[in-house]
C-alpha cells in the first residue's frame, strides 16, 4: 500500500475497520483555510463542542522513506473558541511548504489509562518484534514527546498473546495491531494508541515504520530468526535444571551480577572480546579465587554463558560461590534458595546483589541483618552456623599476620617483570599468545580477583561504620578521597604534558596501553589515537583534585575495636583500616598491570592478522581458542581463520538483532519481557545542571563543564577525567565499579548503571540535572 497523510491514513483505517476506534476527525488543506479562516473555524466549533487537539498532516509526514516525526507542531487541549483555534492552527501550519498540507482536528481524549506507541518491528534492525513504549500517567503525548520516563514491552511476533504482560490490555492491543497490519498490508508500522479507563482502545496514528538498517545488513529471514529463538529457548531450558554440586532448584541469568560482563565487554560483545573475558576470568579463575578465600568450590561450573552472543552470569552458580565452604548442606541450600527468590522478586537489584541480597563477610552490622533477614527461614542454630562461617572467612581475609590479599599483591607485582622476560624468548605467535594468557591468569586476573574481593569486603565494613554512626557520610567520602590510586595520576600527567613538563613519549610509555574497552581489539589504545583522547592544544587542563587528608580518630578506632571484639573478629581497627586502604589501591593497581598485558595480547593478534591479510575487524569474530590453534602452514591457518570469521560474522548478525532482558528468570523471557527499571547508583551528594555529551561525540566535542554519557565503566575511559567534566552517566556499572570510585574521589556527581532504556533517553537529551543527594536525574530539555 502507498501511505498517505496522517489524516488520510486514519480515514482509510476508520472506513476499513469498524471495530477499531478512531476518534472523529476533521481535516482540511492549510492553504484553503487561509482563504476563509472564519468558515473553517465555525465548522470546527459546530463539529466539536469540547477541547480539541490540532495536529499536523503534512505532505512529507508519515512516508515510507522518512516519517519527519516531530518536525511539525501539535497543539493539545485547545478550547473550541475562534481565538484559540486560530492561534493553534497558525502554530501547526506555519512551517508548511506544500499546498496540500493538511490540518487535522480531533477531540481530546480524556480519562486515559495508558498511552503509547507500538512498533511492529524493531526500528533499528527490522527484527520481528512488537516493541511497545507506553506510559500510565494519563497523558496522550508522554511517549511521543519524551517528556517523562515511560515503560517498554518487547514481544516476539511468534509470542502467544497469553504470554504477554498484565501491565495493560496487551492482548487487545496486539489483536488490533495485527488487524491494522492486514488492512495496510504491512508488518512494519508505527502505531500510536491509548486506552481509556474502561480499557477501550483508540488509535491515534498509523504510519510506515522507517527502519534504520534492516537486520543490520544481514539477510536473516523471519523464519530463520524464529528458529534461532526456539533453539535459544531450548538451550536456556536445558541449562536451567538442577546441577550436580550446586544448590538451587533453577538458574537465573544476569548481565550485571558480580563480574558484570555487560559493563566490562558490553551486552553484545564481539566473539574475541567474549572469549578473552571467559579465558581470563569467568571459565575458571573466579572459582579458584573464591575457593582460596574460603567460599564454596563450584568448579567445574562456568560462570558465564553466551546466549546468542550476549553474555550472562549464571546467578545460581555465582551465588553458590559466595556460600562459605564450611556450611552444612541444609543451611547452604536454604540460604541459596532464599537468595534466588530475592532476586526473582527484585530483578532490578541484579547489579547490586553483593550489597543488597548476599552476605559474604561478617561486618559490624552483619549479625543483626542476618538475624532479621532469615528469622522465618532458618533456625537459630542455622543462623549461628552461617554467621560463624562468615566470621571465619573475614578473619582469614584480614588476618593480623599475612592477610590473604597480600599474597595476591605479591603475585601481581611479578607480572610485569615476568612478561618482559617472556617477550625476550623466541617462539611462534600462537605459543606467545598462549603463554601470555597463562601469565595473565596466574599473576594478573587471579590475584586481581582476590584483591577485588577484599576491597568489596572493605566497602561493606565502611558501610557498617556509617550505619553504626562511627563515621559520618562526609568522613566516609573524605576517607575514600584520601586514597591515591593509579588512575588519579593520569590527570597529573596530562597537566605536566600540557605544561611541557612531560614528553608525549614518556606519557604514552606509562598510559599508552589503555583502551576504553579493554577486551575489544577494535578499541584503539591511547598510543594509537592520542589526539582523539588528549588534545594538547586545548586550553582546558584537568584540575587534579587534592587528596583529602582523613584518618580515623582514636575514639573512632576504639569504637571499632570494641565492635570487632563483640563480633568475634581477631584483628584490630587500625589493621582493618590499613587493609581497606591497601586493597582499594591495589585493586586499581592490579587492574592497570594486567590490562597492560591484555592490551599487548590484542596488539599481537592485530599484528598477526595483518600478516595474514586479515583485518582486525574480521579477527574480532574469531575466538581466542581458535586464534591459538596451530597449523603446519600459514595458508592452512589463514583458510581456517577465514572460515571462522565467516561463521562468526553470521552468528553476530543474530547477536545484533536479538532483544533480550538484562535478567532472565525463565527461558520464556526471550519471547516476551518488560524492560526492567534499573536502580541507578548516585555518587556524591552534589547537584548540577549541564549539557549532555554522548559517548560517540566525546572526541570532537569540548566536554568541559558538561555531563558525559558512556555505556561502560572501564578503566580505559579514564581520559574523560582530563576534560574537566561536570558529571557522568553510565548505562552499566555498580556501586563499587571503577567509575563510581573515580567520581567519588573527584567529587564529580555521577549516575552509574541507569540501564538501557533510561540511558538512551538521557544521552539524547540536551540538558540534564543530576541531584545526587536526592537520587534524581532529570531531563530539562
Annotate each language-model stretch with its function.
Residues 12-15, 23-29, 45-74, 99-111, ...:
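ATP-grasp fold ATP-binding core
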Residues 53, 104, 707-711, 728-729:
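Structural motif
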Residues 38-47, 699-702:
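Short amphipathic alpha-helix with an adjacent loop that forms part of the alpha/beta core around
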Amino acid at each position: 500500500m502507498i501511505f498517505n497523510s496522517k489524516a488520510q491514513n486514519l480515514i482509510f483505517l476508520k472506513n476499513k475497520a469498524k471495530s477499531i476506534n478512531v476518534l472523529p476527525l476533521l481535516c482540511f488543506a492549510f492553504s484553503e483555510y487561509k482563504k476563509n479562516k472564519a468558515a473553517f473555524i465555525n465548522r470546527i466549533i459546530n463539529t466539536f463542542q469540547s477541547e480539541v487537539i490540532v495536529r499536523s498532516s503534512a505532505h512529507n509526514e508519515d512516508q515510507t522513506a522518512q516519517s519527519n516525526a516531530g518536525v511539525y507542531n501539535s497543539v493539545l487541549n485547545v478550547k473550541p473558541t475562534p481565538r484559540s483555534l486560530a492561534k493553534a492552527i497558525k502554530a501547526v501550519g506555519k512551517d508548511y511548504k506544500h499546498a496540500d498540507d493538511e490540518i487535522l482536528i480531533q477531540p481530546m481524549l480524556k480519562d486515559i489509562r495508558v498511552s503509547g506507541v507500538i512498533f511492529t518491528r524493531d526500528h533499528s534492525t527490522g527484527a520481528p518484534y512488537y516493541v511497545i513504549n507506553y506510559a500510565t500517567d494519563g497523558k496522550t503525548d508522554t511517549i511521543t514527546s519524551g517528556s517523562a520516563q515511560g515503560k517498554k514491552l518487547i514481544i516476539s511476533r511468534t509470542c502467544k498473546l497469553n504470554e504477554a504482560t498484565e501491565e495493560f490490555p496487551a492482548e487487545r492491543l496486539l489483536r488490533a495491531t495485527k488487524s491494522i497490519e492486514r488492512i495496510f498490508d504491512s508488518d512494519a508500522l508505527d502505531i500510536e494508541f491509548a486506552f481509556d479507563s474502561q480499557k477501550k482502545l483508540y488509535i491515534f496514528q498509523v504510519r510506515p515504520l522507517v527502519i534504520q538498517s534492516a537486520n543490520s545488513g544481514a539477510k536473516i529471514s523471519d523464519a530463520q530468526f524464529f528458529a534461532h529463538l526456539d533453539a535459544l529457548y531450548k538451550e536456556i531450558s536445558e541449562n536451567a535444571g538442577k546441577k550436580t554440586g550446586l544448590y538451587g532448584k533453577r538458574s537465573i541469568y544476569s548481565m550485571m551480577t558480580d563480574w558484570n560482563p555487560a559493563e566490562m565487554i558490553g551486552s553484545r560483545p564481539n566473539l574475541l572480546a567474549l572469549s578473552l573475558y571467559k579465558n581470563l576470568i569467568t571459565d575458571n579463575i573466579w572459582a579458584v579465587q573464591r575457593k582460596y578465600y574460603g567460599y564454596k568450590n563450584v568448579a567445574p561450573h562456568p560462570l558465564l554463558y553466551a546466549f546468542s552472543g550476549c553474555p550472562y552470569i549464571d546467578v545460581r552458580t555465582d551465588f553458590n560461590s559466595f556460600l562459605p565452604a564450611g556450611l552444612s548442606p541444609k543451611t547452604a541450600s536454604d540460604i541459596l534458595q532464599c537468595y534466588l527468590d530475592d532476586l526473582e522478586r527484585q530483578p532490578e537489584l541484579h547489579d547490586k546483589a553483593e550489597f543488597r541480597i548476599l552476605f559474604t563477610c561478617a561486618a559490624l552490622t552483619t549479625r543483626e541483618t542476618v538475624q532479621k533477614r532469615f528469622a522465618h527461614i532458618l533456625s537459630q542454630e542455622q543462623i549461628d552456623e552461617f554467621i560463624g562461617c562468615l566470621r571465619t572467612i573475614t578473619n582469614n581475609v584480614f588476618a593480623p599476620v599475612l592477610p590473604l590479599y597480600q599474597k595476591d599483591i605479591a603475585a601481581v607485582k611479578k607480572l610485569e617483570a615476568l612478561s618482559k622476560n617472556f617477550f625476550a624468548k623466541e617462539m611462534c605467535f600462537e605459543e606467545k599468545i598462549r603463554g601470555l594468557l597463562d601469565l595473565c591468569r596466574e599473576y594478573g586476573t587471579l590475584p586481581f580477583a582476590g584483591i577485588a574481593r577484599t576491597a568489596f569486603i572493605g566497602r561493606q565494613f565502611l558501610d557498617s561504620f556509617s550505619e553504626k554512626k562511627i563515621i559520618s557520610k562526609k568522613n566516609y567520602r573524605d576517607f575514600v578521597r584520601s586514597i591515591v590510586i593509579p588512575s588519579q595520576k593520569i590527570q597529573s600527567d596530562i597537566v605536566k604534558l600540557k605544561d611541557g613538563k612531560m614528553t608525549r613519549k614518556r606519557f604514552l610509555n606509562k598510559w599508552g596501553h589503555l583502551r576504553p574497552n579493554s577486551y575489544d581489539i577494535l578499541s584503539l589504545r591511547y598510543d594509537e589515537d592520542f589526539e582523539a583522547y588528549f588534545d594538547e592544544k586545548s586550553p582546558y587542563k584537568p584540575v587534579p583534585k587534592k587528596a583529602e587528608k582523613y584518618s580515623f580518630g582514636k575514639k573512632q578506632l576504639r569504637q571499632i575495636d570494641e565492635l570487632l571484639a563483640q563480633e568475634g573478629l581477631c584483628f584490630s581497627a587500625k589493621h582493618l583500616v590499613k587493609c581497606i586502604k591497601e586493597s582499594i589501591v591495589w585493586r586499581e593497581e592490579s587492574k592497570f598491570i594486567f590490562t597492560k598485558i591484555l592490551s599487548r595480547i590484542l596488539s599481537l593478534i592485530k599484528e598477526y592478522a595483518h600478516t595474514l591479510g586479515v583485518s582486525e575487524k574480521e579477527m574480532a569474530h574469531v575466538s581466542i581458542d581458535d586464534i591459538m590453534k596451530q597449523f603446519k602452514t600459514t595458508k592452512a591457518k589463514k583458510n581456517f581463520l577465514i572460515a571462522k570469521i565467516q561463521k562468526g560474522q553470521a552468528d553476530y548478525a543474530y547477536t545484533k538483532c536479538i532483544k533480550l532482558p538484562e535478567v532472565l528468570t525463565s527461558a520464556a523471557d526471550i519471547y516476551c519481557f518488560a524492560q526492567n527499571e534499573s536502580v541507578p547508583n548516585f555518587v556524591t551528594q552534589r547537584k548540577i545542571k549541564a549539557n549532555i555529551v554522548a559517548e560517540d561525540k566525546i572526541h570532537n566535542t569540548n566536554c568541559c563543564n558538561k555531563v558525559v554519557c558512556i555505556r561502560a565503566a572501564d578503566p580505559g575511559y579514564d581520559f574523560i577525567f582530563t576534560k574537566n567534566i561536570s558529571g557522568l552517566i553510565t548505562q552499566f556499572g555498580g556501586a563499587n565499579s571503577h567509575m563510581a570510585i573515580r567520581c567519588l574521589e573527584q567529587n564529580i556527581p555521577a549516575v552509574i548503571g541507569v540501564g538501557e532504556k533510561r540511558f538512551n533517553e538521557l544521552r539524547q537529551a540536551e540538558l540534564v540535572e543530576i541531584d545526587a543527594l536526592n537520587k534524581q536525574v532529570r531531563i530539562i530539555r
